[in-house]
From Swiss-Prot:
InterPro entries attached to this UniProt entry: Peptidoglycan-bd-like, PGBD-like_sf, PGBDSf
UniProt xrefs under SUPFAM superfamilies: PGBD-like
Protein name: Uncharacterized protein in bpoA1 3'region
One protein family per Pfam: PG_binding_1
Length: 118
């Protein structure tokens, strides 16, 4: 009985298991990626912070879960993922995340489209 009360308490507090739902066109990338950041600044290798976490999350989702870890540091793995995403979506693979890369990532994330394969 005590275990049942503990489980009920955890579920009521929001620690229950959630199921994955499909993203709708109204779902923003920041909602899909835990709300790390809503700003989309120019990013490049060695940057860090919440905007990098948002980038990493969108890359992770857009590259069929083969993107970088979401750690907030734009290191070699993030650079490689950015360049792969840019190549796959027809952008110059310069590793710099600017307005065009953000726009492609946002579209990919917000539409709930199939991950990029190339």
């Amino acid at each position: 009985k005590l275990a049942a009360v503990a489980v009920a308490t955890l579920l009521a507090a929001g620690f229950g298991v959630t199921t994955a739902g499909s993203a709708s066109a109204a779902t923003s990338p920041s909602q899909l990626c835990g709300g790390y950041s809503t700003s989309e600044p120019m990013l490049s290798q060695d940057d860090s912070g919440d905007a990098v976490k948002a980038l990493q999350c969108e890359l992770y989702n857009s590259l069929a879960y083969m993107g970088p870890d979401v750690d907030g540091y734009f290191g070699p793995k993030t650079l490689a993922a950015v360049q792969k995403f840019q190549t796959c979506t027809g952008l110059k693979p310069d590793g710099i995340v600017g307005p065009l890369t953000w726009a492609k990532l946002d579209y990919q994330s917000s539409q709930g489209t199939t991950p990029v394969w190339c």
